[in-house]
């Protein structure tokens, strides 16, 4: 086992010719080489490792460039370069070696060597030799190594859980390197590669020890695609038995590391308890690592966005205290409205009710109804309203419009094809009202869309601690005490092809049809997993794994199993009131050996069969 090599050994192994012998016994402990370039024009970073610790390479291209210099310039550039502390300079095949290199090599006692290969081959051979010669190995007995989504995942800790989850991960299509007897080798400057140290009884077969001490032939059971000889290590998963008093990372900002062969590997501590699907959590950890390598720091993004929302909410509270008002800007942004007049008033105008009107009677001069309404809502104009105005005498229609525009209307919205006359624009402009154009031709479509949006905003709401998911088209709320496994169960359901609406805090409201609709708070699609921290479901699993809102059809409460009551009848006729509407509820008891996600799917399918008349 090597921790260093020497120039002499490199010369012998790579069959290099010695042009000038300096100190051939210089120790090399860095597996890097450097092909000179900037140095040829006199740019010398005299403090760099490249020019003081790495073996340097000069190819035919660089040597030809040097040969074009004047004698004075050669002297200056080469003398300064050769005075630095790099251990050796290797010229490749056919390189032009000027006399100045020989002169200053002798003066500074430098090793000058010649390769009989071209630059690309020389570089490749030296790198390969150094990576092998300088590798450091250590054996780790109770560690397992797998490749999951291309990520090298090292696992330690709770032995029985580790062996069980490895089988499930292999069944899911991932690859095993070793279940124990792991050797970790450091290659390059900071890369770690793991492989199995134990000799196998059958050549090319991989074995996994089960919890009873027997062995499973992974190669026979799952094929050669389920194994690989070695893998670069990226993350460490430590499995721990669940401890109620222990604090497990719930945000993911504080990155932990563990040292192996002098290098640090990022570590996740995953608590193991009944109902948690470890395979899905470990897969998610691997995907999260890849996401971070791509520059996405999900916990930091979550924290930054949360702070922005807190500041915005604080400012909104200071602006209009506890009044339930909707800024006009939100409606404009939601429906992509084009502002025609009144842009200067948009930021200071609020909508106080869900009322959306077409003016009709007001246009013929009947204003009794509009005067009785406490909060005048948004007014919609289409081609029909303007055709009606054209049938009125000119003086009457102008007077009616003037009277109409004296009321406190938050916003007037035109259909995209309304084509208003000039007098209408003049009157609205003088009145100071906000005039916008919607991207719809039918006024009824605008009224319906605005009503749905405004009703959801102004309706009574409630927030529930749980996870809202969509299964088979049904909106299902998972509830239960903290730590029971709601988020982990939802994570496996997402992995099975279902969709997330909201995690942790779900906001419910009644829509115009009377249905209870659930949606996320201000930050949708984030999920909190103990041990991993905050993960971004939309980024990890794609847009098909999420949706913004969903009607609530069923509640499933996760409970720890009560061993004294294990023969109890199922909870088939429970209901829970949400905003005045009874919602079907089932109890799911969590215990070892029960797959919570699969049980949730069965409960939803059972609910579906009941709706179809099956008993």
From Swiss-Prot:
Superkingdom of this protein's organism: Bacteria
Catalytic activity: [HPr protein]-L-serine + ATP = [HPr protein]-O-phospho-L-serine + ADP + H(+); [HPr protein]-O-phospho-L-serine + phosphate + H(+) = [HPr protein]-L-serine + diphosphate
Family to which this protein belongs: Belongs to the HPrK/P family.
Gene it is expressed from: hprK
Biological processes per GO annotation: regulation of carbohydrate metabolic process
EC main group: transferase
ATP-binding is among the record's keywords: yes
Example of a GO cellular component annotation carried by this entry: cytosol
This enzyme's EC code(s): 2.7.11.-, 2.7.4.-
Ligand binding (ATP): 480-487
InterPro entries linked: HPr(Ser)_kin/Pase (IPR003755), Hpr_kin/Pase_C (IPR011104), Hpr_kin/Pase_Hpr_N (IPR011126), P-loop_NTPase (IPR027417), Ser_kin/Pase_Hpr-like_N_sf (IPR028979)
Protein name per the record: Putative HPr kinase/phosphorylase
Additional record remark: This protein is composed of two complete HPrK/P domains fused in tandem. This unusual organization may lead to a separation of the two antagonistic activities in F.nucleatum, with the C-terminal copy carrying the kinase and the N-terminal copy carrying the phosphorylase.
Pfam families: Hpr_kinase_C, Hpr_kinase_N
UniProt keywords, alphabetically: ATP-binding, Kinase, Multifunctional enzyme, Nucleotide-binding, Repeat, Serine/threonine-protein kinase, Transferase
Keyword Repeat part of the UniProt annotation: yes
UniProt GO MF annotations: ATP binding; phosphorelay sensor kinase activity; protein serine/threonine kinase activity
Function as written in the Swiss-Prot or TrEMBL entry: Catalyzes the ATP- as well as the pyrophosphate-dependent phosphorylation of a specific serine residue in HPr, a phosphocarrier protein of the phosphoenolpyruvate-dependent sugar phosphotransferase system (PTS). HprK/P also catalyzes the pyrophosphate-producing, inorganic phosphate-dependent dephosphorylation (phosphorolysis) of seryl-phosphorylated HPr (P-Ser-HPr).
């Amino acid at each position: 086992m090597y921790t260093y090599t020497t120039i002499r050994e490199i010369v012998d192994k790579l069959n290099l010719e010695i042009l000038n012998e300096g100190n051939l016994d210089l120790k090399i402990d860095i597996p890097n080489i450097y092909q000179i370039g900037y140095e040829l024009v006199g740019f010398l970073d005299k403090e760099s490792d490249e020019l003081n610790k790495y073996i340097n390479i000069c190819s035919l291209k660089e040597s030809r460039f040097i040969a074009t210099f004047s004698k004075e310039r050669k002297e200056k550039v080469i003398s300064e370069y050769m005075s630095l502390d790099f251990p050796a300079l290797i010229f490749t095949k056919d390189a032009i070696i000027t006399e100045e290199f020989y002169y200053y090599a002798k003066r500074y006692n430098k090793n000058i060597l010649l390769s009989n290969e071209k630059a690309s081959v020389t570089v490749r051979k030296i790198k390969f030799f150094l990576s092998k010669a300088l590798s450091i190995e250590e054996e780790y007995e109770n560690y397992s190594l797998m490749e999951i989504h291309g990520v090298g995942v090292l696992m330690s800790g709770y032995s029985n859980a580790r062996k069980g989850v490895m089988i499930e991960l292999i069944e899911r299509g991932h690859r095993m390197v070793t279940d124990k007897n792991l050797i970790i080798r450091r290659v390059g400057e900071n890369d770690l590669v793991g492989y199995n140290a134990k000799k196998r009884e059958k050549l090319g077969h991989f074995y996994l020890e089960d919890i009873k001490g027997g062995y499973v032939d992974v190669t026979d059971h799952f094929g050669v695609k389920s194994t690989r000889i070695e893998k670069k290590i990226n993350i460490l998963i430590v499995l721990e038995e669940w401890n109620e008093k222990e604090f497990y990372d719930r945000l993911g900002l504080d990155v932990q590391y563990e040292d192996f062969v002098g290098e640090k590997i990022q570590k996740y501590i995953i608590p193991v308890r009944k109902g948690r699907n470890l395979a899905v959590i470990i897969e998610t950890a691997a995907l999260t690592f890849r996401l971070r390598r791509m520059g996405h720091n999900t916990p930091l993004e979550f924290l930054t966005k949360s702070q922005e929302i807190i500041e915005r909410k604080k400012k909104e509270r200071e602006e209009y205290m506890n009044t339930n008002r909707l800024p006009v800007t939100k409606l404009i942004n939601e429906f992509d409205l084009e502002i025609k007049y009144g842009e200067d008033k948009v930021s200071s105008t609020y909508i106080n009710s869900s009322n959306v009107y077409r003016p009709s009677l007001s246009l013929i001069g009947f204003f009794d109804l509009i005067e009785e309404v406490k909060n005048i809502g948004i007014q919609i104009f289409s081609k029909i309203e303007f055709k009606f105005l054209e049938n009125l005498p000119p003086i009457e229609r102008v007077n009616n419009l003037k009277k109409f525009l004296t009321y406190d209307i938050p916003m007037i919205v035109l259909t995209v094809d309304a084509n208003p006359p000039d007098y209408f624009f003049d009157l609205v402009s003088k009145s100071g009202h906000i005039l916008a154009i919607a991207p719809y031709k039918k006024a009824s479509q605008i009224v319906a869309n605005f009503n749905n949006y405004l009703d959801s905003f102004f309706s009574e709401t409630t927030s529930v601690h749980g996870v809202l998911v969509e299964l088979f088209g049904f909106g299902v709320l998972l509830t239960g005490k903290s730590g029971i496994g709601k988020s982990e169960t939802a994570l496996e359901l997402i992995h099975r092809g279902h969709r997330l609406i909201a995690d942790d805090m779900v906001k419910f409201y009644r829509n115009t049809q009377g249905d209870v609709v659930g949606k996320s708070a201000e930050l949708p699609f984030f999920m909190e997993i103990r041990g991993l921290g905050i993960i971004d479901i939309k980024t990890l699993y794609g847009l098909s794994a999420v949706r913004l809102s969903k009607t609530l059809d069923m509640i499933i409460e996760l409970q720890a199993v009560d061993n004294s009551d294990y023969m109890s009848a199922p909870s088939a006729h429970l209901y829970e009131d949400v905003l005045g509407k009874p919602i079907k509820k089932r109890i799911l008891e969590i215990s070892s050996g029960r797959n919570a996600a699969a049980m949730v799917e069965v409960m939803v399918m059972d609910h579906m069969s009941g709706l179809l008349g099956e008993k």
